[in-house]
């Protein structure tokens, strides 16, 4: 519902967080578990999509106003979000709330993140590309290696179009990373309060 309202208000784009269910479906979910929003202390990766869609969102901004609206009280899928963005010509900004691992059974460095393999990321790209086509969209992540792997996915699919952008989100911009960003065609996404004029100049000078 939030994205329908954003689209109706004429927003340029809309950011969301994506996690993966037990049966490898992509849903919109920021938190590690559903406890805060739905009162259920379970992780997305421990539930199937069918089980998750039986949950009811009970907490959140203005939830009382939309408590009888299904699209506001049901956990949305990536398909729901992308379809809405496309309908309203909004740019989807998809934060991959996951961390790349080689085989899928490793522990992530950040305990707040799910483990994600390159195959999972290929599925994420394929679904997004299927719905959005040549329209602009973005993948972002705090984990740099996740963005590197998504670049490999794009390259494997011969995706040279400028409609797909990758951004590494960080609260600690590092000028030493400029060459890595440039080589892999990954942009910097940093909080304006965390980046200096020197950082901005260095990144601009390198294109």
Task: Go through each PLM region and give its residues.
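Phosphate-group recognition and catalysis centered on beta-loop-alpha active-site segments
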Residues: 1-207
């Amino acid at each position: 519902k939030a994205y329908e309202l954003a689209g109706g208000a004429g927003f340029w784009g809309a950011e969301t967080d994506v996690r993966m269910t037990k049966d490898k479906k992509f849903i919109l979910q920021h938190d590690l578990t559903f406890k805060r929003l739905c009162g259920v202390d379970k992780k997305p990766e421990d539930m199937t999509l069918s089980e998750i869609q039986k949950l009811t969102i009970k907490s959140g901004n203005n939830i009382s106003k939309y408590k009888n609206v299904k699209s506001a009280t049901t956990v949305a899928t990536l398909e729901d979000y992308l379809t809405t963005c496309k309908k309203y010509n909004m740019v989807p900004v998809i934060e991959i709330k996951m961390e790349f691992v080689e085989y899928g059974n490793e522990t992530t460095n950040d305990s707040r993140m799910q483990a994600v393999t390159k195959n999972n990321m290929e599925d994420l790209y394929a679904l997004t590309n299927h719905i959005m086509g040549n329209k602009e969209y973005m993948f972002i992540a705090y984990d740099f290696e996740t963005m590197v792997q998504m670049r490999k996915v794009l390259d494997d699919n011969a995706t040279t179009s400028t409609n797909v952008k990758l951004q590494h989100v960080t609260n600690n911009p590092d000028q030493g990373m400029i060459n890595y960003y440039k080589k892999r065609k990954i942009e910097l996404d940093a909080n304006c309060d965390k980046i200096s004029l020197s950082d901005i100049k260095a990144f601009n000078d390198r294109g």
